[in-house]
């Protein structure tokens, strides 16, 4: 995959966070003074979410200037443009790309998973189920099988779904807590799902067809919520801690090995980018901007 690394000079915040746990012998101590200038003016709505890097290194987010848009920063550019406007009434949340460059978008008001085929700007409904609460975040296996979290915030409950290569949806589990962040590990044999209000991260065994089994508690926090998650190549899980203003890195053994302090308090999602794939971009709802820090390893897709 071609990757990009260029400064977002007008509205993107590069925040090299503070390393909190010295026990990770692979970490480099980072000081908050390493942060670049914070630009408070933002052209995104409070729905800023869905950070993702496409096949050619372009950087994408949702809700530029107004809800219902997908923003793109071209490789080598210093500014975002509106890449597509979603159909009337659709608003994106999570974004993921498959290995051929197709974009998938969780459209929460209309209970859809949307697709934009690589090389086009045509938005189509890839999957739909009216019984969903609201598809929130997405995860994808190397073979293209998708998963979506499906929270019901009012009832503090949620589900997880599988979407196969033909767009058929299968309910994997219901009656969970408020399912939110979701991710597949590098070996494609574990699915992670977090419950924001309940502050728990669950792990499932995953087979090549996207079936899950052997659910177990992977990690539980005692305060604040969670949002989006991503894995690096070593299987470490990067978790946006909504309200805490940090990204926490958890090893495959369930041990917190790093805590990165952000300038904002409400991170909504994370994604890997940069020349080597080791820059973590973080969207923040309260600031309506993006921050970044350097990871020890590239993201799982690099």
Regions picked out by a protein language model, each given a short descriptive name:
Residues 42-59, 87-107, 112, 129-159, ...:
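Beta-rich, blade/repeat-based domains predominating
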């Amino acid at each position: 995959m071609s990757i990009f690394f260029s400064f977002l000079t007008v509205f993107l915040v590069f925040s090299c966070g503070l390393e909190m746990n010295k026990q990770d012998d692979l970490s480099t101590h980072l000081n908050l003074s390493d942060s670049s200038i914070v630009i408070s003016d933002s052209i995104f709505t409070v729905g800023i979410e869905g950070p993702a890097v496409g096949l050619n290194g372009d950087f994408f987010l949702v809700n530029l200037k107004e809800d219902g848009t997908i923003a793109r920063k071209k490789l080598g550019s210093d500014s975002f443009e509106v890449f597509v406007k979603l159909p009337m009434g659709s608003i994106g949340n999570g974004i993921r790309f498959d290995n051929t460059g197709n974009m998938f978008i969780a459209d929460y008001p209309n209970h859809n998973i949307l697709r934009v085929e690589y090389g086009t700007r045509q938005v189509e409904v890839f999957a739909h189920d009216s019984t969903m609460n609201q598809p929130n975040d997405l995860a994808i296996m190397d073979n293209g099988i998708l998963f979506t979290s499906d929270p019901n915030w009012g009832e503090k409950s949620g589900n997880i779904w599988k979407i196969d290569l033909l767009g058929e949806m299968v309910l994997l589990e219901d009656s969970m807590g408020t399912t939110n962040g979701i991710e597949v590990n590098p070996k494609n044999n574990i699915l992670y799902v977090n419950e924001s209000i309940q502050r728990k991260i669950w792990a499932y065994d995953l087979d090549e067809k996207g079936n899950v089994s052997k659910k177990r508690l992977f990690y539980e926090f005692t305060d604040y919520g969670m949002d989006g998650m991503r894995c690096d190549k070593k299987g470490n899980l990067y978790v946006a801690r909504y309200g805490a203003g940090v990204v926490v890195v958890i090893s495959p053994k369930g041990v917190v090995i790093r805590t990165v302090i952000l300038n904002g308090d409400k991170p909504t999602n994370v994604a890997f980018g940069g020349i080597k794939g080791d820059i973590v971009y973080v969207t923040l709802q309260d600031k309506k901007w993006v921050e970044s820090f350097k990871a020890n390893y590239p993201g799982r897709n690099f």
